[in-house]
Amino acid sequence: MKDTGKEQNHSSFEDTSASEESFKSPKVNKGEKGMARAEKVRAIRKACATRDVEALAAHATSEGGLLEDDLRQIAWPILLRCDEQRQQFDTVSSPELLRHVDEEQVELDVNRSFVYYPKAPEEEMLRKKQQLSNLITQVLREYPMLCYFQGYHDIVQVLLLVLGEKQAVPAVAQISLFRIRDYMLPSLSPAVKHLHLIPSIIETTDPELRRHLGNIEPFFALAATLTLYAHDIQEYSDISRLFDFLLAREPVVAIYLFAAMILSRKKELLEIPADEPEMLHFTLSKLPHPLDLDGHILRAARLFEDHPPESLPLGAWKHIPWCSVLKTSRDPHGKYTAADAVYLFEKQSQQIRSEERRKRALDFLWSHRRSVGSVALAILVGAASFYIRKRGLDASIWSYVGRIQRAIQTWV
């Protein structure tokens, strides 16, 4: 993380204790809490009935999120606009579609799924794993250009457990096309570009902490952001609550969430010497413990509102391609179809191939710079000689060379 040396007005994240206190809810007795919960349940149901996405997003961000799985089963498909996919997936299995190239890896990962939750008899777990395999396979066969990545199954298993097998099919398709599309490209380079937003968010909010982290590359956030935190969070109640928030907001907010977690750990990170980057990287790669999920969610929402992507320093947002899911999702009123997502996927794939060709060419030139330089010089001299002879300037030039030679001899 390069230090720009600029000091500007920043949000009050530096006073960690004060900001922590501001996110704590006022103490209420059990009766008041029960009444507030019941009122929130009614409000969520009303928002679902009227398909009020803004109200649902507000409830998903507030303490406790959408509260219960039966509410999530109504709200999540609305947030993900699953109606657009339902007609495309009439059945749970798609044997008529061609086998996807990544299905072997899918099976390996499915066998390692459901590590932390749910706690169920072996027979039930085998059934869940088969459902998970069917679910992933169907979506990949329907959209064969998508590249499976290890950790995708962590995301899908959350959708499966909350929504059930049938409802999860369009939800998985929607989240793949409109939220994690960049992660399903043939290369991880787009995901790395996402990560470089994190130093910019830290820079604009807490330059002191950003300087302390120095030039540490933000790869420490890859596993968490790639899997929407499903790989790292071990409690089902926590990950389902976090998905309330992530599904209600645009994709880039998942990056802001990781930045918010870093900012909340300022004191801990400053205690680690700056000349121990390995220890800093190790600490940053682990989520805070204990995990104050509601607090981190509120911080992330505030960070995003105060410092939207377009305002970030270090040019990080400019490096995100126009066809990235982060940019195409910035318009809250944009109505993209699955066909649009496929088109954008192909455009970004073309960009990746172009970048890779350019990088290979530059690497070749650098590794052969001496021989390439000699050839280039020879070509330049030859071209200059041809130009001089063609213009009839050779006699004049040799005349000047003779004068210079005589002047040097006289001076010596």
Predicted segments, located by residue:
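N-terminal transition regions in large eukaryotic proteins
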Residues: 1-140, 335-412
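Extended, Lys/Glu/Leu-rich amphipathic alpha-helical scaffolds
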Residues: 31-34, 105, 173-220, 251-340
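Acidic, Ser/Thr-rich intrinsically disordered and amphipathic helical segments
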Residues: 39, 55, 70, 74, ...
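Coil-to-helix interface segments in alpha-helical RNA-associated scaffolds
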Residues: 53, 84-86, 201, 234-239, ...
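Amphipathic alpha-helical segments within well-ordered protein domains
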Residues: 57, 76, 137-140, 156-160, ...
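Active-site-adjacent structural elements in folded domains
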Residues: 120-125, 136-142, 205-215, 223-228
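Extended serine/threonine-enriched, polar tracts that run as long, contiguous segments within proteins
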Residues: 230-235, 244-249
